[in-house]
Amino acid sequence: MTSSDTFLALAPYGRQEVADALSSLPDGKDARSLRHAPYANRLIKLQSAMVPPKVDGTSERVAEIVKGLAEQGAIYPDQMGAIHSDLLNRAYTWNSMGVQESIQALVNDVIHGQNRTLQDELARTKEIANASLLTQFFDSLYKTVDRGQRNFEGFKKLLRLFVNNVPNAEVYGSSGSFSVQINLGGSSQNINLTNAFENLKPIWGARWDAVNNPRIGALLTPNTRALLFFVSSFYDYGAMEPGSYLDNIMRLYKEAIRADVDAEGDAIMELGEAGANLNLRFNDYKDTLNYLLQNREVVPDTAPLELSAEQEMLLKYLMRQLRQALKDGVPADISISTMTQYLDPRLYQTNKVFVEKLQNYLLAAQARNPVYYRLLVLDPNWRPPAGLYTGNYVIPDRYDFEDVQSELEYAGPSRDEYFDDSLFAPGPQRRLNSAEEAQLERDIESLTGHIDEELGVQSQAGWLADHRLPVAFDGALSLTERNAYNTPLPPDSHMRSRSSSVASDLGLLNLSGTGGPGFFASLRPSIGSRQPTGTAVGLRPTTPYSGSGCMRGTGLARKVLNPAASRRGRKLRFY
């Protein structure tokens, strides 16, 4: 085969016909053959002659990519045909080396992503193995304990946090026993988890007692102590039962770890030296570093602290002492410092840390805001905040009344802000219209006329001549000794009948006006009784006798002359 034959074999279909049509005579045989061919065949021949198709399997590659996207769930299966057609059209329209290189780059990216995913999975194999082995270890443990179930479950959660977050900790199992290996600066620490949990089984529910703490501590093996020490780095308040031995020992271990991290301020000095080397101010460098490491503001926990039953009783006793000292006028700092002087020594030794933290908080509250401290002491339901042990106190600042004349202008909230007295307020009073006022005046005039008709009308001088003067001179002219027992009383049946008729008329009268019920009650006459009460001062008889039996007259006159009636402000009307 010659070179020309080889070229013709490799040439695309239709290129030769197009070349013959271009090289032959005008309107020749080759030109007429191409002109009379179907339009689709003629178009395909021209396209193949102008842009020959690639022979590197573009269609197969596009099909593989579309199939892979469908298998990964990136596209729906019913969209494969349309997407494949569009991609082929774009590839054939822009069929060049750039398209082929783009497709190859996409394939390389897919291969690189798969390799990176495999590497990440291999890197997480250790973490997955640790979590799996730790789950197997928990499944092999006892599920319940006699006392301290909350501590048991909380400690398992802390152990899982430790294993998942510490990169140099590895859990492994051997012959039914599980252990954790911790690599520290080239040396390793092996802790047998099975033995540690068996050692802790009788201690889960132990209480923190200053007397029994040495006995409980003697039961802990070095293996168990090491486990408690490492796990305590993830301890937080509320993870275990308050007042228990494990809760206090974990808290003490965590405070020891925190104090040991930067006991001499080495970390702060290193930061300062680094900032100086970078020609930055230390405060700016420290703020930037804190933002990069933390990227959030620390908000102290203000929720009430969970206390044990013993701590609850101790808190109530101490707050009761502070309330009494506040009533007695004892200075707050002295009362807080001496509030434990009458505590039982064993109780104080057991709760020494809690009492000292409480004193620190109360002293800080009293120093920052005495009003807030007084409110805490007087509140019987107050509980210390969760920041009692951490020192992150949230205490409102006291307002300084320097620009006002008196604190009374900005005193505490009034009673109206807490109590709603609207339920007990009297209802709105309805004012009388003109017709009702006229009717009320007519009723009053009718009552007054009826009373005058029943009781009679006299002048003040005539009434005194008929009642007071005879009584005064009767004792002076009498030559016999008189007393309250031998004085005959005049009949008063007519007066009682009149009083009953007046009372019946008063019951039919509506005396309620805008002034409230009983506003016209002073108009009612007072009816005298059958018992003599005596004369007024200065009008007593000259004869020495006790009582007022010598007074004569009707019952109404005796009632008028009664000193008690005068003191009550009752008066008889005169016209």
UniProtKB/Swiss-Prot annotation:
Q: Please indicate which superkingdom the organism of origin belongs to.
A: Viruses
Report what the protein is called: Pre-hexon-linking protein IIIa
Tell me which GO cellular component terms the UniProt record holds.
host cell nucleus; viral capsid, decoration
Keyword Phosphoprotein carried by entry: yes
Q: Which residues form the propeptide?
A: 515-575
The record describes its quaternary structure and partners as:
Interacts with hexon proteins; this interaction tethers the peripentonal hexons to hexons situated in the facet. Interacts with the penton protein (via N-terminus). Interacts with packaging protein 3; this interaction is required to promote correct genome packaging.
Annotated region described as Disordered, given as residue ranges: 525-549
Q: Source organism lineage?
A: Viruses, Varidnaviria, Bamfordvirae, Preplasmiviricota, Tectiliviricetes
Similarity remark: Belongs to the adenoviridae hexon-linking protein IIIa family.
Keywords, A to Z? Answer: Capsid decoration protein, Capsid protein, Host nucleus, Late protein, Phosphoprotein, Viral genome packaging, Viral release from host cell, Virion
| Signal sequence segment | none
Q: What does this protein do?
A: Structural component of the virion that acts as a cement protein on the capsid exterior which mediates the interactions between the hexons, including the peripentonal hexons, and reaches all the way to the penton vertices. Two hexon linking proteins IIIa, one from each facet, stabilize the unique edge interface between a pair of facets. As the virus enters the host cell, hexon linking proteins IIIa are shed concomitant with virion acidification in the endosome.
Binding to hexon-linking protein: annotated span: 129-243
**Subcellular location as annotated:** Virion; Host nucleus
- Posttranslational modification: Cleaved near the C-terminus by the viral protease during virion maturation to form the mature protein.
The stated induction of this gene product is:
Expressed in the late phase of the viral replicative cycle.
Q: What else is known?
A: All late proteins expressed from the major late promoter are produced by alternative splicing and alternative polyadenylation of the same gene giving rise to non-overlapping ORFs. A leader sequence is present in the N-terminus of all these mRNAs and is recognized by the viral shutoff protein to provide expression although conventional translation via ribosome scanning from the cap has been shut off in the host cell.
